[in-house]
Amino acid sequence: MTEILPHVNDEVLPAEYELNQPEPEHCPGPESDMAGKSDACGGCANKEICESLPKGPDPDIPLITDNLSGIEHKILVLSGKGGVGKSTFAAMLSWALSADEDLQVGAMDLDICGPSLPHMLGCIKETVHESNSGWTPVYVTDNLATMSIQYMLPEDDSAIIWRGSKKNLLIKKFLKDVDWDKLDYLVIDTPPGTSDEHISINKYMRESGIDGALVVTTPQEVALLDVRKEIDFCKKAGINILGLVENMSGFVCPNCKGESQIFKATTGGGEALCKELGIKFLGSVPLDPRIGKSCDMGESFLDNYPDSPASSAVLNVVEALRDAVGDV
């Protein structure tokens, strides 16, 4: 028997704790053994709260590990800056993988304050149901399932205004309680930059194993500056970097097939950055205005425009990504 989950509210998702102010720089973390004790805690308005929180191993992590044990490959989609097409690429990656009928694919939207995967995957009006086996994800196709906070909002344009503790609790629920069953791939779309969501997902999934991160950028230096920070975060957090994809890399006219550079790579672009930092360059994807149209319609751009240079480029990136995780 299944039932529809109620909309997200304080009763359904109570905060584990509420801090008096956002965590300061060099904060050891409210749940760490050094919470309230480190040098960074001196004078912090949260000191007493952090000291009172329970310490020790998180009892939910074994449950998360068990729930995700049937998932073969787990991929984080990251970007240093917003607006580079990270969520768009996460959606196209999900469409591309699920085009193989032998693969079972899940898409988890962890951009909690700006969820967009449901719209791009064409299931914006769906709701989440709960059964004895947990939360049932929304199925886009027979072999593509998705989960997002968007399905739990009272209105499509309802704002999510949460601090880190409540975000962490929702991430735990998605990892621990969603009945993904057996998947070949779980694509995890994250917010831009490095935030609570990134730290939490790495902490909660460390034991279950993350194959690595796919980093999305655009060619211009202003985007690459933040990508360098994202890559540094991955290295410090012990997250394997599967590779980098340069999105919006030129514009190919659908009529004359001529190519123009809209966002010029003033410092060499993504490929040069990969050579500099010693990470894998998965490929470049050119601009195609029809990508945005397909996302707005909740349809697969790859199916709608298979002859587009952008479609070929995306499929090449997906092939390189599958090779990077050993799925050949």
Swiss-Prot record:
Its cofactor is [4Fe-4S] cluster. Disulfide bonds: none annotated. Changing C234A: Does not impair function. Heterotetramer of 2 NBP35 and 2 CFD1 chains. PANTHER family: CYTOSOLIC FE-S CLUSTER ASSEMBLY FACTOR NUBP1 (PTHR23264:SF35), NUCLEOTIDE-BINDING PROTEIN NBP35 YEAST -RELATED (PTHR23264). Binds 4 [4Fe-4S] clusters per heterotetramer. Contains two stable clusters in the N-termini of NBP35 and two labile, bridging clusters between subunits of the NBP35-CFD1 heterotetramer. This is Cytosolic Fe-S cluster assembly factor NBP35. GO terms for molecular function: 4 iron, 4 sulfur cluster binding; ATP binding; ATP hydrolysis activity; ATP-dependent FeS chaperone activity; iron ion binding; iron-sulfur cluster binding. Component of the cytosolic iron-sulfur (Fe/S) protein assembly (CIA) machinery. Required for maturation of extramitochondrial Fe-S proteins. The NBP35-CFD1 heterotetramer forms a Fe-S scaffold complex, mediating the de novo assembly of an Fe-S cluster and its transfer to target apoproteins. Required for biogenesis and export of both ribosomal subunits, which may reflect a role in assembly of the Fe/S clusters in RLI1, a protein which performs rRNA processing and ribosome export. GO terms for biological process: iron-sulfur cluster assembly; tRNA wobble uridine modification. InterPro entries: Mrp-like_CS (IPR000808), Mrp/NBP35_ATP-bd (IPR019591), NUBP1/Nbp35 (IPR028601), P-loop_NTPase (IPR027417), YlxH/NBP35 (IPR033756). Keywords: 4Fe-4S, ATP-binding, Cytoplasm, Iron, Iron-sulfur, Metal-binding, Nucleotide-binding, Nucleus.
